[in-house]
Amino acid sequence: ASYDPKRGEGKYDTVELGATLDQALATKGEEAAGVKCTSCHKMTDEKLVGPGWKGVTERRTPQWIMNFITNPDPMIDKDPEVQAQLEICLVRMPNQGLSDDDARGILEYMRKNDGVK
């Protein structure tokens, strides 16, 4: 199967998003991100170790984000845009072993950060 740059690679074919933000889910995601993500990622567009998260939900589909944060290794190997980021950041994102619930919460936290109300 060929690599789909809109979907990524992993178990998520679609991710249902509410029209409005799920505040409780975003709060859980913020907690998970604080443990697993924010040592390398800022919530702005500034690079820390990895790229900043600002605008990611506008650039990427929900399923791409969910697949990437739960299954980064094959996507780093196959996605040309991720490979370009790797040349800038120089560090491969390690698999953080996120649960489905944590990954979905982190996606909601990213949506909140990008201004979804």
Question: What kind of region is each of these model predictions?
Answer:
Residues 34, 38, 42-45, 58, ...:
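Sec-exported extracytoplasmic/periplasmic mature domains
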